[in-house]
Design a protein with these regions (language model features):
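Structural signature of beta-strand start/N-cap positions in the alpha/beta core
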Residues: 63, 70-72, 95-98
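Conserved alpha/beta-hydrolase catalytic His-Asp/Glu region
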Residues: 7-66
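Hydrophobic "lid"/C-terminal helical patch
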Residues: 16, 51, 90, 117, ...
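Short beta-strand/loop motif that positions the catalytic acidic residue
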Residues: 66-67, 73-75, 79
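Glycosyltransferase donor-binding loop in the core domain
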Residues: 4, 39, 79-82, 106-109
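Short alpha-helix in the alpha/beta-hydrolase fold that links the catalytic acid
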Residues: 60, 69, 83-92
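Catalytic active-site module of serine/aspartate enzymes centered on a nucleophile-bearing elbow/loop
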Residues: 95-133
Length: 133
């Protein structure tokens, strides 16, 4: 189980893991242990504050067309928190963006498919560096 302890917070953390991870990763003990450690560091009160801050955050998509810098948008194909359609929208609004969709990943794509994400970031950095030279 995932969670920063037992009881209600442990149950919430477990349910959250089911929402942020690709179904194929729900039995990955190492990944679940990492999420449990992350949850433990934040604690129940911190977790609630994080969620409130995220839900209360202003919609800043209207700013994206004005950002004139290279951008890489990475999204897990099965991300339930930031669905692929939102990542596609974000990438389309940014003037110089590339979208990378990570298969067999949810919201935690960097933890679920680290080799794929790191390779994509390195390829993107090489392209950005080549353009600037």
């Amino acid at each position: 189980a995932v969670g920063g302890g037992s009881g209600a917070f442990g149950q919430v953390a477990q349910g959250f893991a089911e929402r942020i991870l690709h179904p194929s990763r729900l039995q990955d003990r190492e990944l679940l242990r990492l999420l449990a450690d992350m949850a433990s560091c934040v604690g129940g009160e911190g977790f609630v504050r994080q969620q409130q801050a995220a839900m209360g955050r202003a919609d800043t998509r209207n700013w994206l067309p004005g950002l004139h810098a290279p951008a890489l948008v990475v999204c897990g194909r099965e991300d339930q928190v930031t669905p692929l359609t939102l990542s596609q929208e974000m990438a389309s609004l940014l003037p110089d963006a590339e979208l990378v969709v990570v298969d067999e990943a949810g919201h935690m794509s960097i933890l679920e498919q680290p080799d794929t994400v790191v390779a994509a970031v390195l390829r993107w950095l090489e392209r950005v560096d080549a353009v600037r030279l």
